[in-house]
Amino acid sequence: MIATMQRWQRHFTCIAPDTPGYGLSDPLGVTHAEMADFAEAVIEFLDAIGVGKAAFYGFHTGAMLAAAVAAHHPDRVHTVVSNGYVIPTSEERAELVAQYLPPFTPSWDGAHLAWLWSRMREQVIFFPWYRKDAADRLDLNLPPPDALQSGLVEFLRAGDHYRVAYRAAFTMPSAETLRRMTVPALVTASRTDPTSRYLPRALDPADGVTIRECATPADTLDLALAHLRRARTSPAPKAVATRPIPGRLWKQMLDVPGGQLRVRRNDDAGGRTVVVVHDAAGSSDTVAPLATSFIGRRPVVAIDLPGHGESDNTLPRGAVTVAAYAKALRTALDALGIRECDVVGAWGGGLVGLELAHLAPGRVRRLVLAGPLYFDKALQADLRARYAPPIHPDRHGGHLLQAWHFIRDQGLFWPWYNATREGIIRTANHVDPEMVHRRVLELFRAPDSWWRAYRAQFAYPVRTRLRTVKVATLLAAADWDPMRDYAIAASKALPHLPFRTLARDPGEWGREFMPFLDA
């Protein structure tokens, strides 16, 4: 929706909440919901940000949701535009519910990603995507791989939950909704949009409902804009800060020079804040079990590093280094008002914490490196050359299996490219499909950053920086972690750095770190 918002920004204050279960919004917590349930969530959102009444625009599934909000809560709606509204027959509805929404479950071999790529292609070749007759062929260009990849990433964010809002849209009494509409409404679609076939089925709509087909997608946006501008609108509210949610990590977008950084945090407990830093190709989501383990013990903050997770890449152009990440972390802490903290870094995130301790030693009181990358120069050079090859979207989807096996092999071999007997990780096999799937999504959320971040980590002078660190530092690793041997070697070489073996579950690490952090 960002392109549409930018198109209209000089006319309106545009606010686009992620539908529950999609993007960054929490799901409703049910496997089946009606569109009225989603509409109620929209009203709760309006209440939370202080909007009494608004004009609504929705596209495809959003078109159904916008109409549902107008139908169920007309007192909160000035006017509504539904672009891409579906009015299936009862037979079509039953077929769509049965065929359009297969379960999406990670497979050990990554086959679910190959299926999804084909699914993303088919939905712009046929409608419905599962039908292959000539009559179902769409008169559209096949989007380039980058555009398909963008849609695929949004699908991956929702996961199997993607079916909930789709099903609600298909089962919504859409014709009846238009007949009982009491606010001014426009229902439209371009001729190239497969939903345009439903416009003639909008029989006997309410007097204030306009049904109109347009020649092009751009024409639908111009028509929608004209409709929205005719309506009375309300003053935009002041931005409302995200409110804490007790007992869990809650999200915050932090304004910093160059963009925004996503923060996940919890402030239930008092004391000095613990800052948890993720690895390359990670985010605050990948360290969420570790961060959550501090809830009730300390305030905890986990920040998506620039270019990772949902953070903008705020690093200066060409400056992808551990030092640059440490400076960005310091800027984020300044914006959060955190003057002193303990830092717990997971794998490469520990290097960022270590550099922050050098950059701002008064800021970091205690430092933990979980799985420290204590490599000699020869191994660092080999890792820089071989560990992180860029992965680019491919027309036929081959990049998906490349990403899948890159992540999966990290749980089988060390380094992942040493697929020999010598490289076998013999302590445990970390190849759970759900875990691999989550980490593949992290790659795709950071397409231009993850591999550069790995290379930056492998160029960092970790041995020198550990030898000269002035902050009390703990080295730690679980017995399944290939970094354990490196951590032990570092502790032996640098006796001022104690080592601790960690529980197998990162959700236990917070409790295990507390004696050191509280010392």
Language model: regions and residue ranges:
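Conserved HGGG/HGGXW glycine-rich cap/lid loop of the alpha/beta-hydrolase fold
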Residues: 1-26, 52, 264-312
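Conserved serine/cysteine hydrolase catalytic core
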Residues: 150-200, 429, 433-488
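Catalytic active-site module of serine/aspartate enzymes centered on a nucleophile-bearing elbow/loop
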Residues: 203-253, 495-519
